[in-house]
Amino acid sequence: MSILAEKLSSILKRYDELTALLSSAEVINDIKKLTELSKEQSSIEEISVASKEYLSVLENIKENKELLEDKELSELAKEELKILEIKKSELETTIKQLLIPKDPNDDKNIYLELRAGTGGDEAGIFVGDLFKAYCRYADLKKWKVEIVSSSENSVGGYKEIIALIKGKGVYSRLKFEAGTHRVQRVPETESQGRIHTSAITVAIMPEVDDVEISINPSDLKIEVFRAGGHGGQCVNTTDSAVRITHLPTNISVSMQDEKSQHKNKDKALKILKARLYEKQIEEQQLANAKDRKEQVGSGDRSERIRTYNYPQNRLSEHRINLTLYSLEEIMLSGNLDEVINPLIAHAQSQFE
């Protein structure tokens, strides 16, 4: 038996074990264990179906090769073997993809955070432009976008936008967007026609629940204050704004979009959990990177991943040396698959 066949046999064995366990009274009465084993079985269901079919094809190939010795059946066996070899090749391609380790966060919703960096007002304007492109992409994928928090600047741009994006495969498609995005263009306010370079950071944080990350209440510093508007003027006469700081990591989240202090606190806590989970992911990726041939990117906010050059209509994805001369079309249509698909393909190739 080949190494691949042995691996697939072990997967099928585990699938059958899980089927038996999930029907046992002990597991049925243990909600935590039931959920855990159900998730495991679901994660290997697709590869199990393909494995069963592949092993069946191998058995049929073996039987037909034996029939080649039979004069009456040899021609029929030859024809059957041609079909079986094609099927075997197709299944091997499918199985190869299915054996790539699945990111446990791929099916999660995300918090998308865009923040203006260097470049002043122009950086803030690009935060808005890129956010619109993500919203158009979400429409194409039939995802739901909900702005959780936003902070505008004085020229129609944004200092920061945080949005919750819900839908199938959101994290799997957008996780490679994390990092620093650089834009080169002539600002509308530039009378001399000079090209300005500015940058914004993008963070992609999986939405998490209390089971996945727990926070000790004693590790939190919670402050309340009055919400401020443009120019620092007060827009609320009550202390409805909330700032929560996780003392061990010094990660802080402020929220003032809601009139209710309770709602602001709830939103801030959810984003704080997402940021702490994101930190865990980054640390794990750094540890795993030592075992990889190469990484698409760490997801670190400081990593410059992409340049948007408007005068040349050029989008450059630095991690995989991809250059596209259709920047304006991509931004207006939201068809980010032109960039995302090559990034995913590159990431998958690292497991081959």
Curated annotation (Swiss-Prot):
The keyword Cytoplasm applies. The keyword Secreted does not apply. Signal peptide: none annotated. Keywords: Cytoplasm, Methylation, Protein biosynthesis. Its main location: cytoplasm. Pfam families: PCRF, RF-1. PROSITE patterns: RF_PROK_I. GO terms for molecular function: translation release factor activity, codon specific. It is found in: Cytoplasm. Residues 288-309 are annotated as: Disordered. GO terms for cellular component: cytoplasm. Residues 289-306 have a biased composition (Basic and acidic residues). The modification N5-methylglutamine is found at residue 233. It comes from the Bacteria. Methylated by PrmC. Methylation increases the termination efficiency of RF1. Belongs to the prokaryotic/mitochondrial release factor family. Peptide chain release factor 1 directs the termination of translation in response to the peptide chain termination codons UAG and UAA. NCBIfam families: prfA, PRK00591.1. This is Peptide chain release factor 1.
